[in-house]
């Protein structure tokens, strides 16, 4: 996967292009052969009644070991590990996997430490308003994503869209990430072609112009139509990057129109009623 020198060069090139880079961070669990276990730190993990490693309660993730956030040593080392990537490689933040499975007070503590190094950007793979109070700028808009899926298959209506915004639990300053696909959706629930059919670009436009920040998943700019294997390396056929012009225009529209900006900097969705 390259060397530390390679990665530093990548980060610099990204910054030279006036872009930011955040890393995926899985704080809830580790592999069962993690180096921490080699170092006899089994007490950093959640153990079953027989003293064995176990997955996170309520999941079927038998290929991972749940971490014990009641252990202050483990929490400290997790924060040290996050800090390492900011100090040593100048990354700009983290996308935090299953953030709801980790205590919110840990994220608050981690954010305080990271911001002492430099201001970072934190994305929670969760949909919890409390995360935005102290630790995260952005969270996944899963509920709206499922509404879009439901609109496409006829299970939802515009009334559901109206209800979603009327019952919004998030503050205007909270960034919400909007998307039509991601690594979970593609592998487990189907490609955009499967879920949206010929309307996939219309829903992509909706996700990019509704309140929030749009995500484009690997392969969308190539109109890639295959479920990627979740646990194995599975390469994308990029072809001629068929949808690059579409997404370029869409994101330019998002960038150049203040009404489409994120959080409190942009506009808010309003609904007009009519008797016609």
Each language-model region and where it sits:
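The substrate-binding groove and active-site-proximal loops of carbohydrate-active enzymes
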Residues: 1-4, 60-76, 92-101, 144-155, ...
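Substrate-binding/active-site clefts of carbohydrate-active enzymes
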Residues: 1-89, 107-116
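Active-site-proximal helices and loops of the catalytic beta/alpha 8
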Residues: 15, 81-83, 87, 97-176, ...
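Hydrophobic faces of well-ordered beta-strands that scaffold small-molecule active sites
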Residues: 21-23, 94, 122-124, 140, ...
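Short loop/turn motifs at secondary-structure junctions
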Residues: 89-92, 212
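Conserved interdomain hinge at the start of the Helicase C-terminal
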Residues: 200-202
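Conserved short secondary-structure transition element at the edge of the structured enzyme core
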Residues: 204-222
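Carbohydrate-binding surface patches
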Residues: 270-276
């Amino acid at each position: 996967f390259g060397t530390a020198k390679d990665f530093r060069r990548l980060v610099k090139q990204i910054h030279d292009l006036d872009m930011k880079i955040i890393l995926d961070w899985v704080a809830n669990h580790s592999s069962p052969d993690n180096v921490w276990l080699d170092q006899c730190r089994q007490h950093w993990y959640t153990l079953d009644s027989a003293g064995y490693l176990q997955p996170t309660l309520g999941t079927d993730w038998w290929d991972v070991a749940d971490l014990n956030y009641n252990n202050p040593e483990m929490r400290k080392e997790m924060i040290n590990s996050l800090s390492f990537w900011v100090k040593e490689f100048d990354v700009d933040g983290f996308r935090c996997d299953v953030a709801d499975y980790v205590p919110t007070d840990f994220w608050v503590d981690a954010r305080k430490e990271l911001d002492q190094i430099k201001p970072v950007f934190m994305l929670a793979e969760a949909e919890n308003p409390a995360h935005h109070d102290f630790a995260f700028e952005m969270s996944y808009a899963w509920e709206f994503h499922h509404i879009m899926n439901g609109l496409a298959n006829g299970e939802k209506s515009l009334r559901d869209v109206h209800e979603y915004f009327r019952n919004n639990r998030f503050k205007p300053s909270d960034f919400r990430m909007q998307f039509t696909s991601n690594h979970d959706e593609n592998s487990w629930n189907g490609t955009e072609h499967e879920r949206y059919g010929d309307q996939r670009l219309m829903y992509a436009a909706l996700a990019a112009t509704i309140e929030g920040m749009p995500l484009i998943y690997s392969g969308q700019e190539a109109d890639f139509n295959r479920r990627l294997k979740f646990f194995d390396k599975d390469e994308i056929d990029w072809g001629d990057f068929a949808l690059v012009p579409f997404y370029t225009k869409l994101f330019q529209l998002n960038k150049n129109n203040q009404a489409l900006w994120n959080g409190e900097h942009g506009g808010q969705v309003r609904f007009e009623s009519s008797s016609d």
